[in-house]
Amino acid sequence: MLVFILRRMLLLMLTMLLVSVAVFLITEASPGNVARNVLGSFVTPEQEASFLNQLGLDEPAPVRYLHWLVGSDWRARRRVGLPLQRLVTEKGFVEWWAALPGGNLVRWKLDGDTLIAQIRRPDGAVEEVPDNGRWRKRADGSSYFWGVDAHNRAVLWEKGTERKAWVFVVGSGWKEVSGGAMDYLPLKKGFLRGDPGVSLRTGRPVAKSLFIRLRNSLVLAGIAFAVVMPLALALGIAAGLREGSALDRSLSVGGMVFSVIPEFAMGIFLILIFALWLGWLPGATVFGEKAPWQRPDMLVLPVLTLTLIELGYVLRITRASMVEVMRSPYIRTAFIKGLPYHRVVFQHAVRNALIAPITVIMLHVNWLLGGIVVVEVVFGYPGLGKYLLDSALYKDINALEAGAMIMVVVAVGTQLVADILYTFLNPRIRYR
């Protein structure tokens, strides 16, 4: 068993690596223009080129993939020559600083030909002092310096250059300035170290936003899962044991009806009844990302929508599997030998009949976490699926790639759990 689990884990890790390449390539090739989404539809080619350069989006695809997966701080540290430190402010924004030997943190800015150091003291106060002593000389006599700027980038400045760049000035928007950096390296630790970057849409760390959205989806999916799965399995087994009876026909027809109704139609129908006509429940989540914790009653309609849809599908799969097992020769042989009915059913039939539903259930765990985007949009629920949809529409590359990889991790993880459960449900299965 241990060898099987280790082998499966290695295979799943290789799968995730290959899928990460596919996710990156598909996201990069998706339609949309990041610069136009951020700067506006009237952006000029010069502004777009400067913006992409500052975000590192004009780098070759292999370099961008490497930075997204394992980060860029290790590369920037060699250029800056100082350790780099990542801070998250009280408002949730990310700041990168270079660490001085004395313990202070520093960033730089260029004012004409004067290099200004912004030194952050341990108490949080920031002091600006001239720091021209850090200019380095090349063989041709030109002066240059690699440092960290206030926009969380490692930048290369050259003294005396008149390079033009478009920068964001608070209160004024994007403005053209002279003396821009010659090269930019946006700083992040990478997906594998829990820092896929900053959202282009919100300016906040993607990891923190994903954690909140994933937590909200887990709440919704967990409640729906806890309600649906025991009920669907019990009803499916009961229907399968009474094939052709009134109970079987009623459950089969009801399950088919609920499973074919589109998610948006089911959600709107429940909103009309319980929110508009009866006024018992709120029809939408109208608060922020922490709404599920502030108003638990807002979970009722989304959970009920998922429950009705999932109940019908899992019930039908369980019923079909139970009917097939009860018709098997070894079940008939057990009855002929005189074994008690309950022993045949619960020790032999049910265990084998659960193999197909377990596969479906594990697949639906992925759907409950990230595939219920329609339900989340209908109810305005701040979950992972809605976050991925908003990121895709905006082409928020960092958020979209990280969210997609979270779904991949969940998918391969649930598949591993399903494979392990098979060995307990069916002793005929042997893994070597």
What are these regions (language model features)?
Residues 1-60, 108, 113-157, 211-212, ...:
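N-terminal signal-anchor/first transmembrane alpha helix
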Residues 2-3, 214-247, 260-263, 275-432:
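Alpha-helical transmembrane segments of integral membrane proteins
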Residues 9, 47, 51, 55, ...:
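Hydrophobic alpha-helical segments of integral membrane proteins
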Residues 24, 58, 72-79, 264, ...:
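Phosphate/oxyanion-binding loops and surfaces in catalytic or ligand/nucleic-acid-binding neighborhoods
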Residues 60-229:
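An internal, D/E-rich "acidic patch" concept
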Residues 149-173, 201-204, 209, 245-256, ...:
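Hydrophobic alpha-helical transmembrane segments
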Residues 267-275:
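C-terminal TM-helix exit segments that contain a strictly Trp-centered aromatic cap at the helix terminus
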